[in-house]
């Protein structure tokens, strides 16, 4: 990477946060060109601690990564804006209600969103799902259902049990997805397991896997897309048609 040109860091994910921290600690390793981080908010939540936040073990500020402060420490500009797409042919990042941003080099760390599979609140983006849980009444007699019995769904529903010891909780799985030991654990926690696609009109939280951010063309026209809406990358985490202009996480 030469000193000339503009490097854009698209998204405030964990990888970009760690890179900023490294540049702040070792400024001699920071590239010499103009660098800007673009993210929809000035803070990011560390997702690994979210079940603990839901359970009441942590306060929200303990999970918050201050991206603006990291940028200041690393000598990087920060722009608070929502990324809506990417035009790799013209080397432009598309933003909501803002002019597009030109780049010479681009690094993507935009995260993922929950895969839609039913009516409910997706666990990702985290800000919306956490606001939903804050709005819920722990004494409500209507069961809250977590849809998806993978690792995330299990963590979330068990965290909810600690948060709400008396609230009726359900976990919806594909038939036969959970092994007997997990079934027993959920039974002991008084969490009802629902098989299949049983309809549910009450409040629900989607933990149904993740997919890419759902960008529309020209991204899909100029960049190869992998499954679940993710951008295809080479073994070096680069985008083959755009290398070396972009790297991707």
Locate predicted features.
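FAD-binding core/adjacent interface of flavoenzyme oxidoreductases
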Residues: 2-3, 7, 73-143, 207
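Beta1-alpha1 glycine-rich phosphate/pyrophosphate-binding loop at the start
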Residues: 2-76, 155-181
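Conserved N-terminal Rossmann-fold NAD(P)-binding element of oxidoreductases
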Residues: 10-12, 108, 147-148
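Hydrophobic beta-strand scaffold positions of dinucleotide-using enzymes
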Residues: 35, 107, 203-205
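Short loop/edge segments at beta-strand edges and connector loops
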Residues: 79-82, 87, 173, 193-197
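FAD-site-proximal beta/loop scaffold in flavoenzymes
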Residues: 121-140, 199-249
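Rossmann-like NAD(P)H-binding beta-loop-alpha module
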Residues: 131-167
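Internal nucleotide-binding/catalytic subdomain
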Residues: 168, 180-217
């Amino acid at each position: 990477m030469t000193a000339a040109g503009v490097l854009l860091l698209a998204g405030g994910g964990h990888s970009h946060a760690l890179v900023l921290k490294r540049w702040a600690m070792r400024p001699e390793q920071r590239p010499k060109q103009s660098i800007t981080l673009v993210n929809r908010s000035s803070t990011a939540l560390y997702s690994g601690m979210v079940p603990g936040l839901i359970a009441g073990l942590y306060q929200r500020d303990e999970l918050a990564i201050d991206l603006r402060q990291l940028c200041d420490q690393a000598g990087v500009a920060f722009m608070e804006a929502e990324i809506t797409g990417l035009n790799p042919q013209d080397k432009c990042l598309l933003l909501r209600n803002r002019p597009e941003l030109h780049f010479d080099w681009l690094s993507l760390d935009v995260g993922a969103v929950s895969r839609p599979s039913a009516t409910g609140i997706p666990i990702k983006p985290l800000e919306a799902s956490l606001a939903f849980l804050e709005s819920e009444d722990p004494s409500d007699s209507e069961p809250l259902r977590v849809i998806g019995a993978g690792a995330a769904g299990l963590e979330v529903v068990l965290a909810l049990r600690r948060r709400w010891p008396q609230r009726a909780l359900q976990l919806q799985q594909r038939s036969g997805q959970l092994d007997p030991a997990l079934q027993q654990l959920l039974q002991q926690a008084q969490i009802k397991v629902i098989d299949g696609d049983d309809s549910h009109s009450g409040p629900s939280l989607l933990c149904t896997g993740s997919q890419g951010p759902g960008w529309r063309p020209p991204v899909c026209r100029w960049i190869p897309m992998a499954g679940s809406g993710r951008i295809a990358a080479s073994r070096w985490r680069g985008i083959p048609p755009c290398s070396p202009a972009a790297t991707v996480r």
